[in-house]
Amino acid sequence: MKTLVLITSQFPFGSGESFIDSEYPVIARSFEQIIVISQNVSSEKTRKVVTSASVYRYNTTTSLSGFLRLPIQVLANFSTIQMLTNEEISFRRKAENHPSIKNLYILLKKIIKAVQLKDFIKKVLAKEGINESIVFYSYWLKTGAHAISLLDYKNSIKIARAHGSDIYEEKTEAGYLPLLCYSALRMNAVFFASRDGKDYIERKIKVKGRGFLVSYLGVTKPDFGETKRSETDKFVIVSCSNLIPLKRIDLLIKALETAKTEKPLEWLHFGDGILRNELEEEASLRLNTKNKMNFRFMGHYANNELLKFYNRNKVDLFINTSSTEGLPVSIMEAQSYGIPVIATDTGGVREIVVEGTGSLLPVNFLPADLAKLIEYYIGLNEENYKAIKGNAIRNWESNFNAASNYRDFLIKLNSIFTAGSTDSSSLI
């Protein structure tokens, strides 16, 4: 394969999309030339890319100069904008899901962003002198996928990954993801992070796409050398997420307040976000008066630093309380270190928290439900607890090991490129 055009939201800038860190080095070796187009225009570069790669930033927000150019872009792409609008409305009507006025506005904004990104990609390729044998790879089934669906280059293919926030419409704030199905059907392949995501899209489209594939992400377990793990008599609980409403860390705080145990507890949360101050205050009110209970908000940790923490410290339980997920990389990381997991049964979570590795909670669980599970894991005897730890590590090794998963992904990608670059077919 000659050229990879990888379209991301963050990578290699900022702290987002840390899960690309494990994939990128594996796939980068298979291409002569790599172009990364990131939609992060403000953060510093935090990840390494191969020295031969070209990295471009694309600003998805409209500046004054961009706003002034907008009428020209709309006129130049009017037929494309009209086609996409008609296709989306037609599809939604067939699905008996007529778009509202609000959704039409969201659709138009998304179409214009897709057209603008498409034009930007074409300019980048012209600058780089590339016009054929390209793998267009959007890391999300969002704007990047919409943009590449509109491109047509000789001996080239278009692929996208699909996770959670980019496919589960009902769980978004607007309840609507414009061009979702249009773009999914115009890729040579869509790689879903979970079986649940693939099944969801197939039900929505009412078509079993021949290029709809399940391709689990994976995590690497770095070799930190000989280390002595910290010893403590405390039962240590870890959670790891952005501090935003859908992660529902408040429910975990209430569960910790409710849990009854004679054993000292320590809860550590890794991650930051808009609710941090509010959640720290709530934790102080509810947990500071609880005997034998300590907690710390650790803030943002770089991915490698978090894994180093797991390697060097005793962690007894990992908890995820999200209302919606794809298939969380944070759980893969915990399992790679043999940490039992409690998580909500949403999205593809049940594909990783399988029997013998932890416990699933209903999405609408009560704090008391989680408290009982915490008490259960605290009360496990050493033999049963070690069995769960062993199961967790084996599950990671068999299903979520980055080395094997991304090697398999490359094999599939080579096959699709060989077939797709000759007939330029999409999924429809």
Protein language model features and the residues they cover:
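Short hydrophobic beta-strand element within catalytic cores of glycosyltransferases
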Residues: 317, 336, 340-343
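A charged, aromatic-enriched C-terminal amphipathic alpha-helix characteristic of glycosyltransferases
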Residues: 305, 365, 382-415
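Acidic anion/phosphate-binding donor-loop and adjacent secondary structure
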Residues: 65-68, 170-174, 202-203, 213, ...
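Donor nucleotide-sugar binding/catalytic pocket of nucleotide-sugar-dependent glycosyltransferases
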Residues: 38, 56-57, 160-163, 181-225
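Conserved donor-binding/catalytic core segment of Leloir-type glycosyltransferases
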Residues: 191, 223, 228-247, 253-256, ...
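Nucleotide-activated donor-binding/catalytic signature segment of Leloir-type glycosyltransferases, i.e.
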Residues: 280-312
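Aromatic "clamp/platform" in nucleotide-sugar-dependent glycosyltransferases that forms part
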Residues: 323
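Conserved acidic donor-binding segment of nucleotide-sugar-dependent glycosyltransferases
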Residues: 355, 359-367, 376-382
